[in-house]
Regions:
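Phosphate- and other anionic-substrate recognition elements at nucleic-acid/protein interfaces
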Residues: 1-154
Length: 154
């Protein structure tokens, strides 16, 4: 993401078959590890878990999220968390947008045609981070370090 505009690099979904929970969590961990190894991000933004009407679903979502966070933490990546409302506010301008509105705005902001709702949600979370004070401050620090490196290489 540049200072003025977000740019699309890649997106996708880690799909896990109807395996035992431990195998699904392992697949998520390994999938996120592969993405980190391939793209070398310098930070990660994730959506906070919300309490759903189904407690079992919320617990499983929390476990899957934990597997993804540990995969990133193993690479010493800073992890930023945002609520669904914060993400919707940053992308659509109001905190109660629906999935179609999020998907439409992500496609417009990044000039992509992301038809997978889960991938669009992940991209929305990344764009949200870029639009927040933490995201802007982290980018400024990173650009400052890169500038110092470039000057020292001269």
């Amino acid at each position: 993401m540049s200072r003025s505009r977000a740019s699309y690099i890649a997106s996708g979904c880690i799909r896990v078959a109807a395996l035992p929970l431990s195998e699904r969590l392992k697949a998520i961990f390994e999938g996120i590890t592969a993405v980190v190894n391939e793209h070398s991000p310098n930070k990660v933004a994730v959506e906070k878990v919300f309490m759903s009407k189904n407690p079992d679903s919320a617990i499983k979502l929390g476990q899957a999220r934990g597997a993804a966070i540990v995969a990133c933490a193993n690479h010493d990546l800073p992890i930023f968390e945002y609520s669904a409302t914060q993400i919707k506010q940053a992308i659509v301008g109001r905190g109660h947008a629906d999935k179609h509105q999020i998907q439409h705005m992500v496609n417009a902001l990044l000039s992509v045609d992301e038809s997978q709702a889960d991938a669009a949600d992940a991209l929305a979370t990344a764009v949200c981070h870029g639009h927040t004070a933490d995201g802007i401050a982290a980018l400024a620090v990173q650009e400052s370090r890169q500038g110092r490196r470039r000057r020292s290489e001269r």
